[in-house]
Swiss-Prot record:
The gene is Ggnbp2. It comes from Mus musculus. This is Gametogenetin-binding protein 2. Keywords: Cytoplasmic vesicle, Developmental protein, Differentiation, Phosphoprotein, Spermatogenesis. May be involved in spermatogenesis. GO terms for cellular component: cytoplasm; cytoplasmic vesicle; nucleus. Induction: By dioxin (2,3,7,8-Tetrachlorodibenzo-p-dioxin). The modification Phosphoserine is found at S360, S602.
Length: 696
């Protein structure tokens, strides 16, 4: 706490105030010098945080001497602006403004190491400015006490005033230890000045006391006579009943009208003890019938006057100390902010920008983690799709070799059949007269399907090109062992030791009749071409010339196979845009017999009559097309070896086919009926098939 070290006498306008000394105005007749000790602002004896101090020293060294001098200057506007925002008490704000104005006028080093210039500029001393450790202690040790000090001040809930600036403070209160506290903080000079009582002031206190307790006229006169004896106006020897021991320790100066009270603490405590009942409260009628009783009443009034004076000094000291601390901490806080802003300008980045950058970095890290998770999920889905539909197993060299083999096979087949046409892609469908299905291994690179199904030959395609009669509760057929696949030309069949009879028909739009299987396969092939390779719809195979060859193959006994009588139905594909024709026929030479092929061989084959006729009078040896197709269906459960995963994969990849399945069937039915009506006069079997199809 601040101490009272000196007294400003009247006429001493230019008192030599030292560092951290300010004047304390008690009343019109008393002004003391208030001093703050050095231990209040010890800049060297604090234990500082090593890491923070090191960082502050680094920031301090970044500033040049000129930049540091500019940073360590703040205006009164900045200080008073912070004052209005932080301090709610009106009395405190006025006191700080008054003290700052006094320091601007006087220029006293009251806030050292802070200095106040004549233009209202607050700055720091050169020694503190250049010492980084002292500056750190000032800014971050003492400067951090501002908010704590303001919060610790008790305030009134009504007007937000503190207790020191409240109106209730001026009311007399019971005696306490405050007078002893302020008495110990005074120097001897200040104590002598405090106990120097003015006679006029004591008389005012005495008159107030007499009115308060309603003294009668005689008693009042007795008290006034005792007061006059104290100030030396009356001779005490002439007064009857006067007790000189009561005025012991009191000395008067009649010329200066002063009363000097003994400075001993015990004597002061004795005088204040007389005044204690007065401050306890209550009014009562008092009497002073004798001079000695009147002397005691005068001593009581002297104690009251002395207590009020000490209480006023204590109040002024507390208020001025609080004002000085507020101004000092406000100045330190303003200088700290100015220093930090200057450092931020030098660094080129502010704390707010650093905070935003940290938030942005956290956001980028979070987005990167989410992107990694999305990439992992995408990779898992991609791997799953790759497992369902693996990559092609054939390299470019293998495909080239396969194309060469297919070309050689087509040429050999056409030469074997004696056909004069070019060796284009064709498929031979062998329909037996009994319950035998086509046993034709399909080419490995027929449609470029990369999947090899379980239980199939390595050369067969894993993609199912047939269709089921319903979406639910049925499985799609496979090309292997399928008559429809044989008629469509996407299967291969070549039994051991058998040569395929391959024929080719030129594409002619209006060229007579065509065979039933060729026309149907052409329609089906064109429909599937829309979904996969977008082939032209108008490429249908006209087989008028092929009908004659078919008839020759049927009637000529030399074209029959040795194992039984078979009918060769040849389907010819259209020419594609590709320069290399894709072969849908391949032979299985030198390989192990496949399961489905062995099953085909195990099916009993029955011979049919040597000559077949499509006429109505052909007899029992002639079978209709419906019977041939019905007999060609395989009913063995051993051939159903397509897995459920393959079925689901095929259904997922051919959704458009299933959605338009009914349209395809209706379109095929209309085309076939139209064909039968046009060729009814040539082939009676078409009439029978049309009747059967219409009934169905």
């Amino acid at each position: 706490m601040a101490r009272l070290v000196a007294v400003c006498r009247d006429g001493e306008e230019e008192f030599p105030f030292e560092r951290r000394q300010i004047p304390l105005y008690i009343d019109d007749t008393l002004t003391m010098v208030m001093e703050f000790p050095d231990n209040v602002l010890n800049l060297d004896g604090h234990q500082n945080n090593g890491a923070q101090l090191k960082q502050f020293i680094q920031r301090h060294s970044m500033l040049k001497q000129q930049d540091l001098s500019i940073a360590m200057v703040v205006t009164s506007r900045e200080v008073l602006s912070a004052l209005s925002q932080l301090v709610p008490c009106v009395g405190c704000r006025r006191s700080v403004e008054r003290l700052f104005s006094q320091l601007v006028e006087s220029g006293n080093p009251a806030l050292e190491p802070l200095t106040v210039g004549p233009k209202g500029v607050l700055s720091l001393t050169r020694s503190c400015m250049t010492d980084a450790k002292k500056l750190y202690t000032l800014f971050y040790v003492h400067g951090s006490k501002l908010n704590d000090m303001i919060d610790a001040i008790p305030k009134s809930k009504k007007n937000k005033r503190c207790q020191l600036h409240s109106l209730d403070t001026h009311k007399p209160k019971p005696l306490g230890g405050c007078w002893m506290d302020v008495w110990e903080l005074m120097s001897q000079e200040c104590r002598d000045e405090v106990v120097l009582i003015d006679s006029s002031c004591l008389l005012e206190t005495l008159e107030t006391y007499l009115r308060k307790h309603r003294f009668c006229t005689d008693c009042k006169n007795k008290v006034l006579r005792a007061y006059n004896i104290l100030i030396g106006e009356l001779d005490c020897s002439k007064e009857k009943g006067y007790c000189a021991a009561l005025y012991e320790g009191l000395r008067c100066c009649p010329h200066e009208r002063h009363i000097h009270v003994c400075c001993e603490t015990d004597f002061i405590a004795h005088l204040l003890g007389r005044a204690e009942p007065e401050f306890a409260g209550g009014r009562r009628e008092r009497h002073a019938k004798t001079i000695d009783i009147a002397q005691e009443e005068v001593l009581t009034c002297l104690g009251i006057h002395l207590y009020e004076r000490l209480h006023r000094i204590w109040q002024k000291l507390r208020a001025e100390e609080q004002t000085w601390q507020m101004l000092f901490y406000l100045g330190v806080d303003a200088l700290r902010k100015s220093f930090e802003m200057t450092v931020e300008k030098v660094q080129g980045i502010s704390r707010l920008e650093q905070l935003c950058e940290e938030f942005s970095e956290e956001e980028r890290v979070r987005e990167l983690k989410q992107e990694k998770k999305r990439q992992k999920r995408k990779n898992r889905r991609k791997n799953k799709c790759v497992c369902d539909t693996p990559a092609s197993l054939h390299t470019a060299d293998e495909k080239a070799v396969s194309r060469e083999k297919e070309t050689d096979f087509i040429e050999n087949s056409c030469n074997a059949c004696g056909s004069a046409e070019d060796g284009e892609t064709c498929v031979e469908v062998m329909v037996t007269s009994e319950n035998t299905s086509c046993t034709c291994p399909s080419s490995g690179n027929l449609l470029g399907s990369p999947k090899i199904k379980k239980g199939m030959s390595p050369h067969c395609n894993g993609s199912d090109c047939g269709y089921s009669s319903s979406m639910e509760g049925s499985e799609t057929g496979s090309r292997e062992g399928s008559d429809v696949a044989c008629t469509e030309g996407i299967c291969n069949h070549d039994e051991h030791g058998e040569d395929s009879c391959v024929h080719h028909c030129e594409d002619k739009e209006d060229d007579g009749d065509s065979c039933v299987e060729c026309w149907a396969n052409s329609e089906e092939n064109n429909i599937k071409g829309k979904n996969k390779k977008k082939k032209k719809k108008s490429k249908m195979l006209k087989c008028d010339e092929h009908i004659q060859k078919l008839g020759s193959c049927i009637t000529d006994p030399g074209n029959r196979e040795t194992s039984g009588n078979t009918m060769h139905t040849v389907f010819h594909r259209d020419k594609t845009k590709d320069a290399h024709p894709e072969s849908c026929c391949s032979t299985e030479k030198g390989g192990q017999p496949l399961p489905w092929f062995e099953h085909r061989k195990s099916v009993p084959q029955f011979t049919e009559p040597t000559e077949m006729s499509f006429g109505p009078d052909s007899g029992k040896g002639a079978k209709s097309l419906v019977e041939l197709l019905d007999e060609s269906e395989c009913t063995s459960d051993e051939e159903i070896f397509i897995s459920q995963d393959e079925i689901q994969s095929f259904m997922a990849n051919n959704q458009s086919f299933y959605s338009n399945r009914e349209q395809y069937r209706q379109h095929l039915k209309e085309k076939f009926n139209k064909y039968c009506r046009l060729n009814d006069h040539k082939r009676p079997v078409c009439s029978g098939w049309l009747t059967t199809a219409g009934a169905n």
